[in-house]
Amino acid sequence: MKLLTLTKLVLSMTFLLIISINAENTIYAKFETPQVTITGNADDPAIWVNEMESNLSIVFGTDKYNGIYSYNLKGEVIGFASAGRINNLDIRTLNDTNYFFGTNTGSNTIDLWIYKNSVLTDAAKAKKFALSDNARYSKKTNFLAYGICAGITAKNEIIAFVTEAKGPRIQLWKFDNDNLKLMSTFNNDNASESEGCVFDDENMTLFVSEENARGIIRSYKLTNEFELKDMFKIDDRQRNIVGDPEGLALYKTSKNDGYLVASSQGNNTFNIYQRNYPYDFISSFVVGDSNLIDGVSDTDGIEIKNNYFNEDFPNGIIVVQDGKNTGNVIKSKENFKYISLDQLQHILDL
């Protein structure tokens, strides 16, 4: 009887803690996209920021068995690329040129699309844009390609990291002279599988999520010689991660400061860490149900931009994949949710 009472007490305290976190750190979606066409397929968002006409920015979302959707800032579809099994997508902009990197799990390739700002702006004005069905560049990874994150080095080099499904490897690619070149291959420690990653351009730091057997977020420093060094274990299941750590995103408050945000998939929360070493855990938040839009659960990909977009997103935007779109009849079909960044700023007391 005493053991049973103690167990009930512990469970009750845990429940109250969860309720407390949810009550204080709950944010809500402002818009959502339509569901993807096939069950269980939405995965990773990416955002092209229109620096000249911010309201004409474009959100992209992968439908990982079909291709890539394009959305406006209200979550409305403005195009679809039948690009195949694009699992993850990331974007970097240098001068007036935009580089869209994707991983194709059907062909096990790193794919690259390139567009000028003017092309994207004109298309956004016309409310019609899709990436081409065929990437401009495509190279075999020679392993099961899974996640991807792009970057720009201090020397203005366009790079991308590809993570391996069912293995520890990470490839570093560089785009130069109209060519995708494999620069090096590393191991994410002894990981069994990695997907989510994000590269901090200004701090030359790679963050990677390990899934499956263990749930670990690690950081690595990238040298000018394209070597990953100084591995650091930021968090794991013995601390603040439940289930798999999935999508990773940076919320930059200045050139070198800000926060790392990670999807803790097992308890439908998002963890917040300091952007810089030792990457201290700060807090967690959830995306809850509102009167119009359901909450978010089982999230894979996440993206954050702190630009002014419009009156709906005056301080920035968070876009997350919703793995259980419970507000619709077909609950197993997924979509993407848009959240105003000012809600996260309130949690962080910024």
Residue ranges and their predicted role:
Residues V10-I18:
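Bacterial N-terminal signal peptides
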